[in-house]
């Protein structure tokens, strides 16, 4: 039984009878019995109609209420996009009819739907469509479900489950907007009852705030390597797989889920065999990591090949994406895909503007001397640590660092409402001058994703990328390092902590800063 407005209206009229008739099967049902309750759940008779969650407005409201000092750049209105000049190819990609508005001057040519300019226009259209269309009793508080009651299914065609586990289920489905078909991903994932209750009061888990930040990076054309998030719903009775301890069999359980609708990708990074493709993937991932580190102090905490997706795009010879970073242009060849940094479920921010408590371990300052970046260590006099009741206590002096000279250096940990008494002024909002140890961990996960090694935060290990080219491996291996929070940060290895510096170290040797002759520039991105 799925939601049907006419049948639910009929149910509303007869549900209080002693033996009401099921409007879906025309059979009598026992009042307050299991079938009766299921019909009530589907029709949600006792809930006032609601609207789809507008992620942008709610996250901005959350920011304004909780962190008024955070400044997120306002997205510019999507420009009318000119198609890049391309040489004709004997292999033509199927072109859908023009999109999206009633104004013929603002059509979107889906032949170039992989460009960020087009993706931003499509995102706005899809978000508006979902907000306007999915807006009736189906999605009222806690009843927007892909599994179990399946109240959302009627809005999509060709729905397929493409991933399933204890976290929930990932679906892909199509929506039709003005005779143009778009595929989107729908993630139905388990959340706690506490998170669900907070969400209904518009107090969203921080992951949703991060999704909004990724949308802003995309809308401001800084970096294309994130998924657009369109909207978020909640389901009080979703069905997920529940693993039984010491039993190989599994069964499903009914729980509470968030249902997040996002831009669809095609696969993870498995299958990259050419040197150009491997280098392009490395550049794109490091560019995305640089954005989240510098702008928001976000530590991803789970970068691995399964969490970097791939959006396949058409390619032709001599096509490039231009990235502007620190005053230098990098020309990244179009190798047939856009890499997407995905899954911020365990991420957190150490920015004082966002974090509610922890501002990170910062053992050194980045200085620029003799045309190179170097670390300059500093010390603190006090060290915060939480007791078993969660109260911050002071440890003086702080723990010392390991290695030659470490006895004179301290482990510098910063937290909200705690003065660590540093020996120099520390700007906790400047992640380029005062990086955190977590930034090193993210970058190590990126390079180890290619050459192999232990994951830095999560349990498990990266395996070497299958088919990794010797030139790529040789370029990456020098930047694999094993540091602990109590290690002395290597003076001449700032690139281990700053993704932008690592980009320059690796990609100048492959000629990425040299403008290719007669290059077709598909799009330009201005990294922060």
UniProtKB/Swiss-Prot annotation:
GO terms for molecular function: ATP binding; histone H3T3 kinase activity; protein serine kinase activity. Transmembrane segments: none annotated. It is an enzyme of class 2 (transferase). It comes from Invertebrate iridescent virus 6 (IIV-6). Residues 70-96 are annotated as: Disordered. The active site is at residue 302. Residues 156-507 form the Protein kinase domain. Residues 73-95 have a biased composition (Basic residues). It catalyses: L-seryl-[protein] + ATP = O-phospho-L-seryl-[protein] + ADP + H(+); L-threonyl-[protein] + ATP = O-phospho-L-threonyl-[protein] + ADP + H(+). One of its GO terms (biological process) is intracellular signal transduction. Its EC number is 2.7.11.1. This is Probable serine/threonine-protein kinase 380R. ATP binds at residues 162-170, 187. Belongs to the protein kinase superfamily. Ser/Thr protein kinase family. Keywords: ATP-binding, Kinase, Nucleotide-binding, Serine/threonine-protein kinase, Transferase. It holds the Pfam family 2C_adapt.
């Amino acid at each position: 039984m799925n939601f049907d407005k006419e049948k639910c209206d009929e149910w509303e009229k007869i549900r209080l009878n002693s033996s009401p008739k099921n409007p879906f099967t025309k059979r009598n049902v026992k009042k307050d019995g299991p079938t009766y309750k299921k019909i009530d759940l589907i029709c949600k008779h006792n809930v006032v109609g609601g609207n789809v969650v507008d992620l942008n407005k709610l996250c901005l409201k959350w920011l304004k209420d909780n962190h008024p000092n955070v400044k997120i750049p306002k997205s510019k209105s999507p420009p009318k996009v000119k198609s890049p000049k391309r040489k004709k190819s004997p292999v033509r990609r199927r072109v859908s009819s023009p999109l999206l508005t009633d104004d013929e001057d603002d059509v979107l040519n889906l032949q170039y739907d992989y460009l960020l300019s087009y993706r931003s226009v499509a995102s706005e259209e899809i978000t508006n469509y979902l907000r306007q269309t999915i807006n009736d009793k189906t999605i009222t508080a806690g009843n927007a479900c892909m599994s179990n009651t399946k109240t959302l299914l009627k809005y999509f065609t060709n729905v397929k489950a493409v991933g399933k586990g204890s976290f929930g289920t990932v679906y892909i489905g199509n929506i039709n907007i003005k005779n143009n078909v778009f595929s989107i991903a729908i993630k139905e994932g388990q959340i706690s009852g506490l998170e669900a209750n907070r969400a209904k009061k518009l107090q969203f888990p921080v992951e949703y705030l991060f999704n909004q930040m990724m949308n802003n990076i995309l809308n401001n054309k800084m970096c294309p390597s994130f998924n657009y998030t369109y909207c978020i719903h909640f389901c009080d009775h979703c069905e997920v797989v529940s693993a039984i301890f010491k039993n190989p069999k599994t069964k499903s359980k009914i729980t509470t889920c968030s249902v997040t609708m996002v831009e669809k990708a095609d696969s993870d990074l498995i299958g990259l065999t050419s040197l150009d493709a491997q280098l392009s993937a490395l550049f794109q991932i490091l560019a995305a990591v640089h954005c989240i580190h510098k702008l928001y102090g976000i530590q991803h905490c789970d970068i691995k090949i399964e969490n970097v997706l791939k959006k396949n795009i058409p390619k032709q010879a001599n096509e490039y994406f231009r990235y502007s970073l620190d005053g230098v242009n990098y020309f990244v060849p179009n190798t047939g895909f856009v890499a997407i940094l995905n899954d911020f479920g365990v991420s957190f921010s150490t920015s004082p503007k966002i974090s509610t408590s922890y501002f990170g371990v910062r053992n050194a300052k980045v200085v620029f001397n003799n045309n190179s970046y170097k670390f300059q260590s500093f010390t603190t006099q006090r060290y915060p640590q939480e007791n078993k009741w969660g109260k911050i206590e002071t440890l003086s002096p702080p723990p010392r660092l390991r290695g030659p000279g470490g006895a004179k250096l301290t482990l510098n940990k910063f937290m909200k409402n705690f003065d660590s008494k540093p020996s120099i002024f520390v700007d906790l909002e400047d992640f380029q001058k005062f990086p955190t140890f977590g930034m090193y961990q993210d970058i190590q996960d990126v390079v180890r994703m290619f050459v192999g090694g232990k994951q830095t935060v999560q349990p498990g290990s990266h395996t070497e990328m299958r088919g990794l080219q010797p030139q790529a491996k040789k370029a990456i291996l020098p930047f694999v390092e094993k540091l602990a929070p109590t290690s002395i940060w290597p003076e001449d290895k700032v690139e281990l902590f700053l993704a932008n510096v690592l980009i320059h170290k690796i990609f100048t040797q492959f000629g990425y800063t040299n403008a290719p002759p007669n290059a077709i520039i598909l799009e330009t991105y201005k990294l922060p």
